[in-house]
Amino acid sequence: MKLLYTDMSQDLTEILTEQASSYAQKGKRVFYIAPSALSFEKERKVLEYLPQSASFDITVTRFTQMARYFILNTSNPKTQLDDTGLAMIFYKVLLHMGDDELKVYGRLRKDSNFINQLVDLYKELQQANMTVLDLQHLDQVEKQEDLVRIFSAAQDLLLAGDFDNQSKLSAFFKEITSGHLDEALSNTVLVIDGFTRFSAEEEALVALLNDKCHQIVVGTYTSQKAYKANFVYGNVYQASVDFLRTLAQTYKVIPDYVTTDKEGNLSFARISRLLESRHDFSTVDETVTEQDKHALKVWEVVNQKEEVAQVAKSIRQLLADGKRYKDILVLLGDEESYKLHVGQIFRKFDIPYYFGKEESMSSHPLVEFVDSLERIKRYNYRAEDLLNLVKSGLYGGFAQEDLDLFEYYVNFADIKGRHKFLSDFTANSRDKYNLDQINALRSQLIEPLDKFLNSRKQKGSSLLKKLVVFLEAVQLPSQMFELSTKASEAEKEQNEQVWKAFTHILEQVETIFGDESLSVDDFLSILRSGMLACDYRTVPATVDVVNVKKYDLIQPHSAPYVFALGMTQSHFPKVGQNKSLLSDEERSRINEATDEHRRLDIVTQINSKRGHFVAMSLFNAASEQLVLSQPQIINESQDDMSVYLKELLDLGIPLVEKGRNRFEAKGDQIGNYRDLLSTVIALNSSHLDLDLDKETQTFWSVAVRYLRKRLDKDQVLIPKVIDDVTTTKVDDQVMQLVFPEEEPLKLSATALTTFYNNQYLYFLRYVLELEELESIHPDARHHGTYLHRVFERVMGDSSSESFDDKLEKAIAQTNQDQPFEILYTEDQESRFSRQILEDIARSTASVLRDNAAVKVECEEVKFDLLLANSIKITGIIDRVDRLTDGALGVVDYKTGKNVFDIQKFYNGLSPQLVTYLEALRQTYKVDADQLFGAMYLHMQVPQLNLSQIGLEKLAAQAHKELTYKGLFVASETEHLTGGNYDLQKTVTYDKEDLETLLDYNIKLFRSAAEVIRSGNFAINPYTEDGKSVQGDQIKSITHFEADRHMGQARKLLRLPKKGKKEAYLELMAKTEEENQMQVSENTISFPVIDHAVRVDKKDQEDNHVD
């Protein structure tokens, strides 16, 4: 064995390539061994350093792959299993064990994460040259017994099924020991690069090969100073020094310090020596120079997005300076959190990149198909799982319109469970759904699925056949082919990998579970676990790309230019964690009890020295320039600076704050025309009117010149920056169709309220007639209709029965009405809602019982008013009351709290009661002095705070809550005193005031009608204070944002509370005369129409949405 080491300023790969080349020239077969994660990069570098750029005698590979070269022709009839196959073996073993057989892990038998941990432990034991019997001295004897029982059963299963139960290195080890490879190995040289430690399995293999091979050359990085030091604990090179000394002591070899004629980057070498001296408590007569500050930079950026943008700009500048993409390497502290930002921003800057990380297949439609299939069976046909399956794009050749219809109906009827999906759908809403069509679609979707999922427990091979029949029935193969025909080349490659993984898993299921009796649940669980564990394997489309990978795999001299992102305390250094079934303490006790070349790794024990060595490798990763960057905010939280970056700052490396000044007049601040274009668009146009300082003016002068040239060249148009939400006038043909000019405009109080809430909301509901998703479950509309029906029956019952008997009779009759019986007997939740409604009816009825001064004139009065021949006001009055003096009043039942607020009325948000009074006035041909008021009756159970009300006042307070609230005519209040009426001064009006309210209400209708007829519907939700928006913003459609579009909101007129009623009445009175003139001047003649009392469906719904 030959041991070599060199400083990190030297290129060890170049030195070892020379060694490999010299042995190859002597006719030796050379295997250049690198760690698995670095073999691709090592192969590229070795080829670059070879004089002839290629060699048939040198193979760059890893330990496990090298073993395949020697044992490839060795007869091995046993079936090979990958990780998925091993997981199936453990699943099968645990399937036959009961909860009581495993005292510690009994409840985890079918947990996929636990099975994956078993697979990891199985592989780790192989790498440690151990068996499960070596797992002594665990914290619990029961835990040891469970693991021995599981692994012993798995081993028996592997032997019984003739599966290969040893690793490639174990098989290689066996062949070497047998002597079959002595001749081949005698002419073999191993060159080992990139290691600072061996696993126990690798360690044993190297020891054996040392006696058989012609030579083994091991190289690593460390300094002469560190290797010769007596005390290395805490040294930056501790990992490599310990590695070298262990090998030197074991094989009685003195390591050689080697160098090349090429001089590395002096700046990185000097910084390395300074850092080493800080950790070994020595002194060096060196300081950081200006050249060093240029070679190594430390950035601080606000957040990750800005950080990646700054790197992208620097890359574009390097390209402008003549550099290549392949000369640039981007390292990430946290791959997952940076992946999205890197992808989006690099594409914006036209930077091709290769992300050296396997990507999970979990988002592929086929994986979603299998996942949904398993969840449907496990959760008994849950609606969302079934819809995910049919919407995967791989389930049958159904049209998207049919699938949308099916999904809409399932959500409407709240279909859940196998029984409901197998039964005919019968629920309907006003015959809105074509049940014949939907049931035919249901049969096509559900029947092949249920035929497979309802299969009895049987052999795995039989279930596989039934699965294939099901997949063919739903056209999965043809749908996968169709998916690929429309895909890009990258997507086609992904589809091929997914299909290959799927078929491979099916083959392994056949192999392992072919003769095993399985339920459909277990069968699908095995498929799902296998598919979710699969990853895409990607290769760069071209060599000339920017490589992106995690930083802890870095080697010195990886690229001329290196950018390391996310170098915060949480990620630099990375702290390894033990997530296996064995704790660190248990591992330590096991290692103490075992002999040489048998060892379990204890990750937490090597964190410190591994972190130091990775940091030194990172600081020497670049040959020209290294940028270390840290964001202040990462993953939505603030993080501190890494201790290694603090050390660099202490040495004198300056901290550069990037992204602070967006208007620096430098070329690299423009970088790429797409970025410049997006920056221009993102700027708030209002800021362009401000006075610009000289620096900003210089920036824009350079930017605009560059942008104009590039845009003219590519014929690109900059879209106009619009910071408001505007609408387009509705086409005249549409308006004529919805609101014919020869007919009066239909409006209701609810429609008017909607209009003044937000004009665009009116457009959606009454022009486009969009509806919210319906549900078979009762909601506020159904609750209100139910209570209306109860009180109609009570008030219309003229029999001699007592009031309470009438009420109970009305409740019973209403419950038996077919619509309510269907609604309120669907499930326990619906029945509970009905109980609550019955309680509300009984509570509210107490108000109706004792009201001798008032007689119910009529109920459910439909009205149809024609206003100046141009507006038809429609609606339904719940109840009309008559006083003993003949005055009429209106009662509107409400399930929620409503009061008459004159401020809201003035602003168009509460016109209902006044509109109903207008209907009374015109329907009964009475004057304002013959009306006594309009009021709401809240149908609810009073809710009282018992901590604030004594028991003696409880009944009185509850009775007080059940009162009529609205607006009343002052002259009629003497007839109402003593009744259940809230007669506050703020809600009582004299005859003249009532006339003013009625006239102003007409103005509200006329103003709304004028805008509606114009076809211009603004997005103008109302605001009360000008700071927040209370109106319906309909954000998902309008994209209205209060902070950006407040100027378009309709601000309500608000007056001080003191004298508010009188002030609003005065404002209304000012417009009274003008309104009368407009009515007389703008009267339009219409053909005589049927004035029969009728109302369209939407207005009926409006008046019952309480």
UniProtKB/Swiss-Prot annotation:
Belongs to the helicase family. AddB/RexB type 2 subfamily. It holds the Pfam family ADDB_N. This is ATP-dependent helicase/deoxyribonuclease subunit B. It comes from the Bacteria. One of its GO terms (biological process) is double-strand break repair via homologous recombination. Keywords: ATP-binding, DNA damage, DNA repair, DNA-binding, Exonuclease, Helicase, Hydrolase, Nuclease, Nucleotide-binding. GO terms for molecular function: 5'-3' exonuclease activity; ATP binding; double-stranded DNA binding; helicase activity; hydrolase activity, acting on acid anhydrides. InterPro entries: ADDB_N, DNA_helicase_suRexB, P-loop_NTPase, PDDEXK-like_dom_sf, PDDEXK_AddAB-type, Restrct_endonuc-II-like.
